[in-house]
Amino acid sequence: MKRRQLLAAALLASGLFSLTAGAARAETIRVAIGTQDTTINCATGGLLIRELNLLDKYLPHDGKYKDVKYDVQWKDFTSGAPMTNEMVAGKLDFGSMADFPGSLNGAAFQKAGRKSIFITVLSGSIDGSGNGIVVPDDSSIRSIADLKGKTISVPFASAAHGMLLRAIKAQGWNPDTDVNIITQSPEVAGSALKAHKIDAHADFVPFAELFPFRGFARKIYDGAQTHAPTFHGTLVDADYAKRYPEVVVAYLRAVIEANQLFAQDPEKYSQLIQKVTGIDAEVNYLFHGPLGLQTRDLTWKPEYRQATVTAISTLKLLKKTDVDLDVNTFIDDRYLREAFRQSGLNYDAALRNYAKQPLVANDVQTGKPITDFRSVTQVWLDGEGKVRNYASAQAAFAALNTLEQGGKKARVVYVQDRSSGLKLFANQAWYVKDAKGNINAFLLKDNADRYAKQVNGNVVDFAAAKTDATQAVAAR
């Protein structure tokens, strides 16, 4: 009896040992991701992955990861700086932010004797759209040329700060004496604009569009006018990436799927962002929909590499850092290339593609495919899940009047700037009607005035353009 008890104890001990050894091998891998939910062009790197549980689909469970458990953690931030602090402190593994704060992230890691790497672009513009300057809605200021001697607020050391400095330099002004630049977060600046405590505010995505959409500001300058590339992307702790390269690739495959889902149904996911963040779906669609302000281009185009170089040099000029970053090693596209390969995509083909998210649609009235996008106008009606597409502004405005007379209400109307191709809120644009009755939209009144002289047209606002379109249809 005693012998059997000893044997049982030995077997039990053996079993406990094997369990203990197994537990030692069953590593728990933390995947701690910092997001910026309200910075909506980071959505495919955080918010959508989290809300749609996309990461779980790609985390590896074979090979050395066979017995691994994952501790996926999400933490939301309103800017890049506090996210960088937590990454350097070892509390986060991934973080999404813009080129300027991302460069500060790399500098902070380097000062700490460590390294972070930029692994993907999430959204950007090779011309600089996304950053912008707004003024109070009732301001007499019409362009940046009117800002000399004025007070302009901006979040310091941001991509918008860099844009503002470039815009001021292009005017031939001294930023220290010709304008009064103060630092303000977008939350503070919104109230300051309403109270007319500042003359203008420069900011990053989505505020140069969000404030005008909410009716208390008007955009007078788009970052595309600087022709200086800007982007948001994702960084990872380099040591983490070396230890768990397959996890980094898994995250990037989730980014790719989020990007594809957004392309398939931009209205649906624009509304999901609104549900989570409170940022209006109409603003989200302006960026993420077809022909949007930015492209959700994940690849490391030369322009985005140059944007990082510019960010580093500007931050040194502003005395925000004294660190020299080697962009050739700071940006690492190896993980993204592998994620593309595993997703069945051609990275090099995507790298060569500079097109905006395409609009593949028929004119809602004629049923014919839209092929000329210079005058495309989109109407999103209350109660409708999809945006209506029109080949011309005059057709869309006339149809909108009819719809409104029938009790329908537009959530938003989008037009394309004839000069730049930028997507605009229709009620924020200036319009020129030529002798043939064609209506063209412009962000800047100066551009509208010049075009009006060329075509012997008149410059009008949105309300007048709608009236003109309706009268033209009635006269046929």
Where do the language-model regions lie?
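A bilobed periplasmic-binding-protein/Venus flytrap-type ligand-binding module shared by bacterial periplasmic
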Residues: 49, 130-140, 230-246, 432-434
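Pocket-lining segment of extracytoplasmic ligand-binding domains
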Residues: 110, 176, 182, 187-276, ...
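Sec/Tat signal peptide C-region and signal peptidase I cleavage site
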Residues: 19-26
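Secondary-structure end/capping motifs
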Residues: 37-40, 244-322
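Short cysteine-rich clusters marking metal-coordination/redox-active sites
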Residues: 362-367
